[in-house]
């Protein structure tokens, strides 16, 4: 995912699902975005999340540690895809940022 925050593009890993590892009763679908290399508060901030590509299906992990390990792999894949699409379509992302902020 590409995340527009304060006029700057950041790479993100987006999960669309029901968190089956922790919520076995399959609650409603949630959209959660992990913004890579971001520290700070998002309270009061406007952000836009652009879905770029699909990495994998949602699965139930045996433990939180297994999930965290896989999130690391997925985050690196998301970072690589972010770098690739922004290198190819730099002008498109510049225009999108200008249109929204």
Task: Give the residues covered by each predicted segment.
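Phosphate/ribose-recognition catalytic cores of enzymes acting on nucleotide-derived substrates
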Residues: 2-101
